[in-house]
């Protein structure tokens, strides 16, 4: 299934380079459809399933940016964002000073999530940030 997704992604990239937008969008759409099937396949690691899905969304966003359609570009960027947000741990303490409304978690949860980012460059940027001092739930346990 992944090899089929890779095939359609490469065919779409090639078609775009050959200035064949119709063939390109068809293959990008096929790759996105396959990524949805892949996302339900439990035999594949969760990180890999998410990465494939997000790449498919970003490819379509990039295509629509190239085509000059910002509405569709934003639609696919939003879809990618929603897929990533499903992995960020949600925090029940919404009154915490470090809670971020737009993503439903505190700074600690977000940074801890980013420390496990599949892109080592991003993970390295946040690896030394101390997150425990910013979490009110952890602070509550330290006081008691």
Curated annotation (Swiss-Prot):
Pfam families noted in UniProt: DUF2753 (PF10952)
Name this protein carries in UniProt: Uncharacterized protein VP2110
Source species: Vibrio parahaemolyticus serotype O3:K6 (strain RIMD 2210633)
């Amino acid at each position: 299934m992944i090899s089929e997704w890779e095939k359609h992604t490469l065919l779409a990239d090639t078609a775009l380079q050959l200035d064949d937008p119709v063939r390109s969008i068809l293959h990008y759409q096929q790759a996105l459809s396959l990524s949805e099937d892949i996302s339900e396949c439990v035999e594949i690691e969760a990180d890999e399933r998410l990465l494939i899905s997000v790449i498919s969304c970003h490819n379509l966003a990039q295509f629509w940016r190239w085509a000059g359609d910002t509405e569709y570009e934003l639609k696919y960027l939003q879809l990618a964002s929603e897929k990533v947000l499903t992995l960020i741990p949600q925090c029940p303490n919404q009154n915490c000073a470090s809670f971020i409304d737009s993503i439903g978690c505190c700074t600690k949860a977000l940074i801890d999530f980013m420390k496990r980012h599949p892109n080592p460059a991003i993970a390295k940027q946040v690896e030394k940030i101390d997150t425990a001092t910013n979490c009110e739930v952890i602070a509550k346990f330290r006081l008691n």
